[in-house]
């Protein structure tokens, strides 16, 4: 693959609601290259979350095509695609059990069967985040919002995806927890800055400046700046 | 042994029992007298009508009439199973009707053709109609309970299901837990019945046979057959309806079509 070929390319994406005869996302075209850190900003309801969900192939599109490394995403590649382009919800969804069980959870899926849970890697990240190894034994029910988000991030990061799609991961967190999440994402990016890509939805202008080197502005379901 | 062929006077005497309910309603001011009277009238009329229909069907003894009656019964059961679901999605009726139809007809056919064998024809109304009726009534419960559980779990665990998809799970891997939970829940009533049958209560069919003079062991043998028939039909039906619903709510692109579910 030539270096300048985008990892993800959206062409004329559209999401339509027949009941209200309204396009929630329309004529959205976008190229995402390896090594980019993109932040998506815009008012509430402008389609930021829908854009991220569409880039993760989570919802059926009503228009347009999504390309992954130059090929259109089709049903045959979806689990593999999602193992390389990982979307994280604003509110982290964890399974019942310990943090360790949450981290091991993805390895039961056939797309990850050839891989193993790497405890050493997780412990390394925990040291960077100044967390004790016994964090792994905490029940997911006892985690604070920040800890839950970090668990969800670690669970995604250990899969070494090419792209992390982060949907306002710090919106519901206090400043200290938000800083932990930022640190976690930065750490993951810095480990291979030429290969890894972040698309981050944020309402926080300062955070956008800290975490991104390209800004997309959305309004009324379209990208109005930065595409 | 013989059975007592009831006269209309005897049936009327039994109707006096319903006066107890009326008296309770009046004494406690429950205001249920009208409902109770209407329910009693409906009981008599509905059973009377079904008796007349069955007499005619037994008399005529034609395969297409039996088949038409069984089809009608299956359709009504399928629609009822769908109606009992708190949530709706496109295709819910198709799912309940097809799964009830396939599961009850297949299992009943097995009992008629392989287990009973001695029936004069595969459609002999004396066997086919009550068996299908009993199986439908019980499978309907399993179907609606299983379907309810499936849609409820999908709605309450939407984030978990989507989280699995975002981490590379196939649609089946993402939905496996709600599917397993739904099938297990749908089968609880029949398993509970099997656990206590004969201890807590005597099943209706067995009671009927005993009243009509059948020897207890003969009635027990029939009841065992019926319990196994109902259990297998309920299992097949619950699995069928949950899997068909899974296919409606998760497309081949491994997307969870959450918006299809409405309250």
Identify the role of each PLM range:
Chain A
Residues 116-135:
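Conserved ABC ATPase "signature" region
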Residues 164-168:
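Catalytic Walker B motif of ABC-type/P-loop ATPase nucleotide-binding domains
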Residues 91-101, 111-113:
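Conserved catalytic motifs of ABC-family nucleotide-binding domains
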Residues 56:
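Helix-to-loop junction immediately C-terminal to a conserved catalytic motif
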Residues 2-10, 14-27:
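A short, flexible loop at the N-terminus of ABC-type nucleotide-binding domains that lies
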Residues 156-157:
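ABC ATPase C-loop
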Residues 64-73, 81:
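Conserved ABC transporter NBD signature motif
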């Amino acid at each position: 693959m030539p270096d300048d070929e985008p990892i993800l390319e959206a062409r004329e994406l559209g999401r339509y609601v027949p009941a209200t005869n309204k396009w929630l996302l329309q004529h959205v075209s976008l190229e995402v290259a390896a090594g980019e850190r993109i932040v998506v900003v815009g008012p509430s309801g402008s389609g930021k979350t829908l854009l991220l969900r569409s880039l993760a192939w989570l919802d059926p599109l009503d228009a347009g095509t999504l390309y992954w490394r130059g090929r259109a995403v089709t049903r045959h590649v979806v689990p593999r695609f999602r193992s390389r382009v990982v979307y994280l919800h604003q509110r982290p969804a964890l399974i019942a059990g310990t943090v360790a069980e949450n981290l091991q959870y993805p390895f039961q899926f056939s797309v990850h069967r050839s891989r193993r849970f790497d405890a050493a890697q997780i412990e390394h990240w925990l040291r960077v985040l100044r967390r004790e190894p016994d964090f792994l034994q905490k029940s997911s029910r006892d985690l604070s919002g920040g800890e839950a988000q970090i668990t969800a991030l670690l669970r995604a990061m250990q899969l070494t995806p090419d792209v992390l799609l982060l949907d306002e991961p710090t919106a519901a967190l206090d400043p200290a927890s938000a800083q932990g999440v930022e640190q976690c994402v930065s750490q993951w990016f810095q480990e291979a800055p030429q290969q890894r890509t972040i698309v981050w939805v944020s309402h926080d202008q300062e955070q956008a400046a800290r975490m991104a080197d390209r800004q997309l502005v959305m309004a009324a379901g379209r990208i109005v700046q930065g595409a | 042994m013989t059975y007592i062929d009831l006269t209309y006077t005897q049936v009327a005497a039994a109707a006096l029992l319903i006066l107890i309910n009326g008296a309770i309603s009046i004494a406690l001011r429950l205001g249920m007298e009208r409902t109770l009277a209407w329910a009693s009238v409906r009981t008599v009329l509905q059973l009377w009508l079904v008796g007349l229909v069955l007499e005619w069907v037994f008399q005529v003894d034609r395969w297409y009439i039996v088949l038409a009656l069984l089809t009608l019964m299956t359709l009504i059961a399928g629609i009822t199973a769908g109606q009992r679901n708190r949530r709706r999605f496109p295709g819910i009726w198709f799912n309940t009707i097809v799964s009830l139809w396939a599961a009850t007809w297949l299992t009943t056919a097995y009992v008629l053709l392989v287990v009973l064998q001695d029936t004069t024809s595969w459609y002999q109304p004396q066997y086919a109609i009550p068996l299908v009726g009993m199986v439908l009534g019980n499978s309907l419960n399993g179907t609606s309970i299983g379907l309810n559980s499936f849609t409820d779990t999908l709605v309450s665990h939407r984030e978990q299901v989507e989280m699995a998809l975002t981490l590379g799970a196939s649609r089946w891997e993402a939905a496996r837990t709600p599917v397993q939970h739904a099938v297990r829940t749908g089968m609880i009533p029949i398993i509970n019945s099997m656990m206590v049958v004969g201890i807590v209560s005597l099943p209706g069919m067995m009671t009927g046979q005993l009243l009509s003079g059948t020897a207890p062991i003969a009635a027990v043998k029939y009841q065992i057959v019926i319990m196994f028939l109902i259990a297998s039909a309920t299992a097949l039906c619950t699995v069928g309806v949950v899997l068909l619903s899974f296919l409606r709510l998760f497309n081949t692109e491994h997307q969870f079509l959450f918006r299809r579910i409405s309250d």
